[in-house]
């Protein structure tokens, strides 16, 4: 149902239910949680990619389960039905989106830091037509990523947003040829994994934390988050710059 592969510091987590368009059932949600628990705990892991098998990212929660009464066991205080969507990891996750990322699948894509979409990608709140609410972060993350007006356009109409429009909105961060989303996401993940990770994670954590703070609190949090990177990485990085690394836009040596 869920497969995990590793390539050095880059992990790839694949939802593998192509016969269900990678809809997530409770067992798959548990496997996604376990996969990202392992990714978070592995000190050698730097970036994860989340994708789906068979040309579809994820069609959402498995409505066959909901129709059989699975929703009656829903606990709003527990993990999200789609898996890790109520967590904030300390490391970045990139979504590689082929085909549909809709309903809960949209919420999984929104949970990721970045979304690399193929030209075939389709995003949407398709659960609108079935009376199924967004309960895996969709109403929270979507406005933060695309703005309130565009988020409400998607939430109220349930319409499809194709790759070009998603890119223009900032819902997709990269758009590549059909079938190339995973390859492009792996290339991007390798670039991110090559940077000094203490500094990268501190800046990322500050970017997420600032939503909960006033401006003064956010600036102080950013300043405090810079202490460890300055002690452990910045001096060495400044030395490499002084010695000529990175001049002319070349960053092979990090």
Please report, for each region that a protein language model flagged, where it lies by residue:
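Conserved hydrophobic/aromatic "anchor" residues
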Residues: 36, 57, 123, 241, ...
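Glycine- (often His-adjacent) and acidic-residue-rich active-site loop
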Residues: 30, 52-88, 101, 131, ...
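C-terminal alpha-helix plus adjacent terminal tail
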Residues: 1-8, 158-163, 183, 187-254
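Hydrophobic alpha-helical membrane-association signature
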Residues: 28-31, 181, 222
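Hydrophobic/aromatic residues within transmembrane alpha-helices
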Residues: 13, 50, 62, 108-110, ...
